[in-house]
Amino acid sequence: MAWRCPRMGRVPLAWCLALCGWACMAPRGTQAEESPFVGNPGNITGARGLTGTLRCQLQVQGEPPEVHWLRDGQILELADSTQTQVPLGEDEQDDWIVVSQLRITSLQLSDTGQYQCLVFLGHQTFVSQPGYVGLEGLPYFLEEPEDRTVAANTPFNLSCQAQGPPEPVDLLWLQDAVPLATAPGHGPQRSLHVPGLNKTSSFSCEAHNAKGVTTSRTATITVLPQQPRNLHLVSRQPTELEVAWTPGLSGIYPLTHCTLQAVLSDDGMGIQAGEPDPPEEPLTSQASVPPHQLRLGSLHPHTPYHIRVACTSSQGPSSWTHWLPVETPEGVPLGPPENISATRNGSQAFVHWQEPRAPLQGTLLGYRLAYQGQDTPEVLMDIGLRQEVTLELQGDGSVSNLTVCVAAYTAAGDGPWSLPVPLEAWRPGQAQPVHQLVKEPSTPAFSWPWWYVLLGAVVAAACVLILALFLVHRRKKETRYGEVFEPTVERGELVVRYRVRKSYSRRTTEATLNSLGISEELKEKLRDVMVDRHKVALGKTLGEGEFGAVMEGQLNQDDSILKVAVKTMKIAICTRSELEDFLSEAVCMKEFDHPNVMRLIGVCFQGSERESFPAPVVILPFMKHGDLHSFLLYSRLGDQPVYLPTQMLVKFMADIASGMEYLSTKRFIHRDLAARNCMLNENMSVCVADFGLSKKIYNGDYYRQGRIAKMPVKWIAIESLADRVYTSKSDVWSFGVTMWEIATRGQTPYPGVENSEIYDYLRQGNRLKQPADCLDGLYALMSRCWELNPQDRPSFTELREDLENTLKALPPAQEPDEILYVNMDEGGGYPEPPGAAGGADPPTQPDPKDSCSCLTAAEVHPAGRYVLCPSTTPSPAQPADRGSPAAPGQEDGA
C-alpha cells in the first residue's frame, strides 16, 4: 500500500512523514462507538507573555471531521488553530489521522482554563480528555502611582494595584526608597493616604507573591506652595492699587516671589462665571517676598478690575487665588477744555469751549468759568455741563483787559485751568459787565460781519465742489483711455497724444472679489485679507527662482508706510477650484498669531492677459536678517566669519520647534520645513515661513519625479517620498534635518548623494551622521526625528521642551576674542564617501596644537574642505573640489 500526504500548503514535510510513520504502527479497525481520540491536550503553566501550543490527535474512518476547541466548555470561535489530515490508505474511505494544534501567544489571565477538543462523527459527539492552562509568575501591575503636584501639608491619596496568579499578592509602599512598613501587610493596600508633605518626595510600591517581587514605577510628588490667603486692598490711587495678602505654607522651600495679575472687569465677563483664566492678556507684576505687598501701577482711573495672586518657590508656582473685584478711584481731568473762544456782540459777551481732549479720569460733572478785568476781582462761575455761556453787560463803571479761563471738574476735583482768553478792551464810560446765564435767543442775532463770513464760506465751498467734479470727470477719462484725445493741427494732420504712465487700474477690493466669481461666504471672509494692488510699491529683487521672485516693497496704509516682502508667482492659477483653495488658505493663515510663525499681511492679484485668472501676490513682513540658511552660511563662509555659540544655535532650534508646535495645534502641515524657509527678525528670533500660499522659489533642493511637482527630497520624510503622504510626523522628519543644518552652520544634507538616489539611500537604513562639535543630546533628538515608523517620532511639543531644557542646561555664551577658520588637515585629504558629514564618519583629524599653537580653532572640518581665514587683503579665489562647500547662495543646490 502506498502512503501519501495531502496537499496541506504550509505543513512541514518532516511532520507529514512522522504522521505517516505513526500510521503504519497504528491499530486498525477502531470501533465507531469508541472515542476516536488517540492523543489529548496537555497542560501548560507559565508566566504572563508565554507562548505555548496544545495538541490533540484522533483516528477516524471516512471523511475526516473538523476539530473544534473548547475552553471551559465554550467553543473558541476565533481560535488560532491548525488542522493536519493524513490518510492511512489510498481510498478516501480508509482511516485518517487528524492532528489539531491550538497556539496560545502571549499568555494572559483570560487564557487560563480547561481545554478540550470536540468532533462530530455522524450523530455522535466526542470530546477529548481535558488539558489545563495555568498562569503563574511575578505579580502584574494593573495600576501604578502617577506623578502629581500637591500643595504643602495637604493630604492626598496614591493608588497601586497588582494581581497574580499565584495569589495572594501583598503590596508594600516605599517613600524615597524607604519602606513605609517593615513587612508586607496582611492584605493588598491599594490606596495609600498621605496626610501631607513638606518636601518633594518619590513613592513606589512593591508587589509580593510566591513567585517573587515586582516593583512599580516611581512617582514624583512635587510640593508646591499653598494658595495665598486674605488678598485685600490696602490703598487706592487713580492709577495705582496697593494690595496685600497672607502667604500659604511652602514646606522646606522658601518663597522666591509672588505674581499679581489684573484684568479689566468689562473685558473679563467670564471671570465672574468662574473661568480659571482671563479671556485677554492680563497686566502682570512680580514682587520679591517678603513683604507680601505690591503696588500695581499703570491702571486706568475710575475703572473696575479683577485681581489675583500666586506665589512661587523653587519647586513651582502655587494655584491662583480667586478673582477679587476692585476699582480705582476717580481722578481730576488731565487737561483743560479745548478751543475756547470769547467774542462780544453789542452788550453781550459769548464764551464757547469744547470738552478736554486729555483723559477725564472719571465722570465729568461740569465746568467752572473764571473771568477778571484789569482792575476788578476775579469772578468764579459753575456752568454745569454746558459748553457755552453768555455774559450780559449792564451797570456803570469801566472794565479793561477782560480775560476768561475755563476748567473741567470731576468728583475728585478741578482739572487744570485753560490759558486766559482776552475779550476786546472796553472804552471808558461803557457799562461794567456782570454775569448772568441767559437763554439762547430763538433767532441768532448776527452782526453784519458774520453775514460776510458766511457768504464767503458758501462761495468757497461751491468753488471746491465744482473743481472736484471737474477733476473726477477728467480722471475717469484718463483711466479709461490713458489721456483724452486732443486734436491739434500740425501741418494739416491730426495728432493724438497718449500718456501710459497716468493709466492705473484702481479697482477696489469689492470689485476685485466680484470679478473672481467666488462664493459669497468666501468673499465675506476675504474682506480683511485682500489688499488693493495699487497700495503696494515694488522695489529691488531679493531673490528669484523657477516659480517666482521675492522683492522688497512698501505697503501704503492709512497713516503710515510699511516695509514688506512681496512674493510674486510665475505660475498662474488655472481653475476656479485652485483659486478658492488659495484664498481659503489665505483666510486661515491670516489668523495665525505666534512670535515664531511668519504672519500673513495680505494677498492681492495682478492681472495677466494670457491667463483666465490673475496671478497671486503674497505680502509678508520684511525680515531684517533674511533667511536662516543664508545667515548660517555667511557666518561660516563669509568674508568675515562670525562666531555662533552653541547657545544661539539651540535657541534657533527651539524657536522653530515652538512655531511648528503652534502650526500642528492648528492642524496645519508645513510640507517644506528647512532652514531656507525660516526667517530671522530684528531680535534674532526665528519665524517659520514659506508654508501654505508660498510657492517655492528655490531650484537646487527640489527634484521632479516624472510629472510630479518638484519636492525637497533631502528634507522630506521617507513615507512622503514613497506615497506622497504628509502628516505632522513628516514635518518632524524635516525638522530633524533642519536641526542638522543649524548644527553644521548651513551645510547641505547628504553631500555626494544625488537627489534621485535619496530614497534608496534612506531605505538602506542610512541617516545623517553626527556633525562635529554637536552635543550628543542634540544628535539623539535628531535621530528620533528620523525613525522609520512615523508614530515613533516625537511630537513638536516634546521637541520644544527638550530643546528648552537643553538650552537652560548650557552655560552662558562667551564671545571668543578672535575666531579663525583654518584647514586642519593640509596636504592630501581623504576622498569623502557619499554622504560624508551626513553619510559616514569623518576621518580622524590631527591635533590642532601640532599645526599652530597660536590659533583658536572655531570649527574642525573634514579633510579636503576649504575654509576661510580673516585677511586684510583680498586673495584670489581658490579652486573648489568636490568636497568643498558651495559658495554662498549655491550650497542649497544639492
From Swiss-Prot:
Residues bearing PTM Phosphoserine: 884
Disulfide topology: 56-117, 160-205
Extracellular side: 26-451
Signal peptide: 1-25
UniProt PTM comment: Monoubiquitinated upon GAS6-binding. A very small proportion of the receptor could be subjected to polyubiquitination in a very transient fashion. Phosphorylated at tyrosine residues by autocatalysis, which activates kinase activity.
Cytoplasmic side: 473-894
Annotated consequence of substituting residue 295 to W: In a lung neuroendocrine carcinoma sample; somatic mutation
Positions bearing Phosphotyrosine: 703, 779, 821, 866
Family classification: Belongs to the protein kinase superfamily. Tyr protein kinase family. AXL/UFO subfamily.
Full protein name: Tyrosine-protein kinase receptor UFO
